[in-house]
């Protein structure tokens, strides 16, 4: 691509020196779950609701709706303030912190949790964004919450910290087990400024190394935010 400027506007044009195959040398994978009335939320969290405010069918000059849902709905990022007092929020992380070298790891469907032993065997590098694709991905087709989902064990989280990762993600609503009232996995990761991405849609995700881009809504001082997440090969 060739970049040109017209006033303050940047324009991108195809570079005639590059072939079509070169321009299409990479593929983008959307790892974001759609948000709708069927979106599963953690028990007690606000459910998604949409209400028409203006409608062309009702004689208005435009369509407009009001959306209501929690900030941890669907695919979302947890910031340290989610579980820690006086901790960092969305305002404290630049967008470039939320992108970089990634590793999507397939966890065998027979595994009920992500264990320290399993993590220790993975080719994880310092500053990696690590996503775990588990049997949870099959739950994305269900519209009811289940307590029996694959979670990350505390010693596995500690192993991830030892390896120096910067972001950890999983394909269900929480990295902690359902009955973990103390949320020790959240606290272990977030107290070390390892951000968490939950609710990933990994059914068609590429397994292995890729570039990952996490783009939360630009709302300041939040403990968590819905995000669009993509992988590039």
Describe every region a protein language model picked out.
Residues 2-233:
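Active-/binding-site microenvironments in catalytic and ligand-binding cores
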């Amino acid at each position: 691509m060739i970049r040109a400027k017209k006033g303050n506007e940047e324009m991108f044009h195809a570079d005639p020196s590059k072939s079509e195959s070169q321009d299409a040398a990479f593929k983008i994978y959307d790892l974001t779950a759609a948000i709708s009335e069927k979106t599963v939320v953690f028990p007690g969290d606000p459910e998604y609701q949409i209400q028409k405010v203006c409608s062309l069918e009702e004689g208005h000059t435009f369509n407009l709706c009001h959306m209501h849902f929690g900030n941890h709905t669907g695919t979302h990022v947890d910031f340290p303030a989610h579980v820690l007092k006086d901790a960092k929020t969305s305002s404290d992380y630049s967008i470039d912190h939320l992108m970089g070298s990634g590793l999507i790891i397939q966890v065998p469907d027979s595994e009920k949790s992500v264990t320290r032993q399993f993590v220790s065997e993975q080719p994880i590098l310092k500053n990696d964004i690590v996503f775990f694709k588990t049997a949870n991905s099959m739950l994305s087709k269900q519209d009811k919450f289940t307590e029996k989902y694959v979670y990350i064990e505390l010693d596995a989280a500690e192993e991830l910290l030892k390896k120096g990762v910067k972001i950890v993600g999983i394909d269900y609503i929480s990295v902690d087990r359902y009955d973990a009232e103390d949320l020790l996995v959240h606290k272990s990761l977030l107290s070390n400024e390892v951000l968490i991405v939950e609710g990933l849609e990994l059914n068609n995700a590429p397994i292995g190394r890729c570039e990952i881009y996490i783009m939360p809504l630009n709302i300041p001082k939040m403990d968590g935010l819905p995000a669009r997440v993509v992988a590039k090969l």
